[in-house]
Regions:
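C-terminal membrane-cytosol helix-exit motif in multi-pass small-molecule transporters
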Residues: 1-9
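Extracytoplasmic gate region of multi-pass secondary transporters
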Residues: 20-72, 76-79, 167-180
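Small-residue-rich segments within alpha-helical transmembrane domains of MFS-like 12-TM solute carriers
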Residues: 43, 129-137, 163, 167
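Helix-to-loop junctions at the C-terminal end of transmembrane segments
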Residues: 81-94
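Structural signature of the two symmetry-related core transmembrane helices
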Residues: 96-111
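Helix-loop junctions at membrane interfaces in 12-TM secondary transporters
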Residues: 113-124
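Intracellular juxtamembrane helix-capping segments at the cytosolic ends
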Residues: 134-148
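A late C-terminal transmembrane helix in Major Facilitator Superfamily
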Residues: 150-182
Length: 183
């Protein structure tokens, strides 16, 4: 049979107890909490795009659901920027990139609430999506670099908590808010 290669943790002689201890550190627990916020900030506004920006699109002569173009544009922009994220991390450091992302994401989200023309919608969406696009991968990288003993378990927990918060808290929560304000 084929021999399965050793994991990086085993090759580095890091005991499993050390991995568990690293995932219980205050910095790691703070990053888990922040990952929940990150996932919410990145994915929740997409649920509101149609209701917030739909009227401006209809006024500009587009059919219903055309506001979803903003969502498609944002996802495409994030894919392109995430592909080149390494150069941004080298230029600004992970902590600097997270801070810049938080500022741009917050400013963009706030500005989107005031956007009323096609130009302002896409400008504010660009600011927002440039801000949030680096959050998820940079947080995973931050844990890998700053809490290396957390290993694969730490990376798995970071991604997992993000998806759990989105699936079990954000989507139902945003849905309840939307249902409340529709009536």
């Amino acid at each position: 049979g084929q021999e399965i290669p050793q994991t990086e943790r085993v090759q580095s002689n890091i005991p499993a107890a050390e991995v568990t201890k690293a995932t219980q550190s205050p910095l790691f627990l703070t990053m888990l909490f922040c990952m929940g916020l990150t996932a919410t900030l990145e994915l929740a506004p997409g649920r509101w795009i149609e209701s917030l920006m739909g009227p401006a699109f209809v006024e500009a002569g587009f059919k219903n659901n055309a506001a979803l173009l903003v969502l498609v544009y944002g996802m495409a922009l994030m894919a392109v920027l995430r592909y080149s994220a390494g150069s941004f991390v080298k230029k600004f450091s992970p902590t600097g990139l997270l801070m810049g992302s938080a500022i741009l994401g917050g400013v963009g989200l706030f500005a989107m609430t005031y956007a009323s023309s096609m130009q302002s919608i896409f400008l504010t969406a660009t600011i927002f999506y440039v801000g949030v696009c680096f959050f998820w991968p940079t947080m995973i990288g931050f844990v890998a670099e700053r809490i290396p003993n957390s290993g694969a378990l730490g990376l798995c927990l970071m991604g997992g908590i993000g998806m759990l918060v989105v699936g079990y808290v954000t989507v139902p929560g945003v849905g309840m808010i939307q249902d409340y304000y529709k009536e």
